[in-house]
């Protein structure tokens, strides 16, 4: 029997958080080996564990996988969260890329100066409500199913819920004009594996605090 996947990253969300979400939603137990200091990262680089000298890195099925997109695609495919055919995969990819763009803007916020951060929060909420969420609201309406693609849970649904919860941390009523997304959030949050991941004490990570931000800067030298 193969061991549990092992995730190598800092204690923050970053690019590993979507991987944590996907594994948790698939009901897969995983271990984490945290990068606490610069020397931990250097050790991974020096022992040849990081193909491009970067994390996230996930040990799974005898591989040391890097590049978050590749890791996510592998997990989605392995655990039947990637559609039933090529066309469904294309839609899942498009929806995931949209939420990836939105979450990428949010992930950058803690490392920005206060004045820049304030402007970007306004930009993110505007983009979320005019560019991204209308697409997903329409997709749910047109598709007429509980899910974005097909008639079962997919990576696209999991990623969208993650994005919704991240944007709600910036503006709690951000879904006020999107009734189908509100209902979607309720449904997805009650999927047993996801519900478990959303409980206190899970491996889901909180937003970065000032101490964590300083440590991340030190580890990655920026």
UniProtKB/Swiss-Prot annotation:
Keyword Transferase carried by entry: yes
Residues given in the record as glutathione binding sites: 9, 45, 54-55, 67-68
Main location group: cytoplasm
Enzyme Commission number: 2.5.1.18
GO molecular function: glutathione transferase activity
GO cellular component terms, A-Z: cytoplasm
InterPro entries referenced in this protein's UniProt entry, alphabetically: Glutathione-S-Trfase_C-like (IPR010987), Glutathione-S-Trfase_C_sf (IPR036282), Glutathione_S-Trfase (IPR040079), Glutathione_S-Trfase_N (IPR004045), GST_alpha (IPR003080), GST_C (IPR004046), GST_superfamily (IPR050213), Thioredoxin-like_sf (IPR036249)
Keyword Mitochondrion: no
Subunit structure, as described in the record: Homodimer.
Name of the protein described by the UniProt record: Glutathione S-transferase
Organism: Gallus gallus
């Amino acid at each position: 029997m193969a061991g549990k996947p092992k995730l190598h990253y800092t204690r923050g969300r970053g690019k590993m958080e979507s991987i944590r979400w996907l594994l948790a939603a698939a009901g897969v137990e995983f271990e984490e080996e945290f990068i606490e200091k610069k020397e931990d990262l250097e050790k991974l680089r020096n022992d040849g564990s990081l193909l491009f000298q970067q994390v996230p890195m996930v040990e799974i099925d005898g591989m040391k996988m890097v590049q978050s997109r590749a890791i996510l695609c592998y997990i989605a495919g392995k655990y039947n969260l990637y559609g039933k055919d090529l066309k469904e995969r294309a839609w899942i990819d498009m929806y995931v890329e949209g939420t990836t763009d939105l979450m990428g803007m949010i992930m950058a916020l803690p490392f920005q100066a206060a004045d820049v951060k304030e402007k970007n929060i306004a930009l993110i909420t505007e983009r979320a409500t005019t560019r991204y969420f209308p697409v997903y609201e329409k997709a749910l309406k047109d598709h007429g199913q509980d899910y974005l693609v097909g008639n079962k849970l997919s990576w696209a649904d999991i990623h969208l819920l993650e994005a919704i919860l991240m944007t709600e941390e910036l503006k709690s009523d951000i879904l006020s004009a999107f009734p189908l997304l509100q209902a979607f959030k309720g449904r997805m949050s009650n999927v047993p594996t996801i519900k478990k991941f959303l409980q206190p004490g899970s491996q889901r990570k909180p937003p970065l605090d000032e101490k964590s931000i300083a440590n991340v800067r030190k580890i990655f030298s920026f």
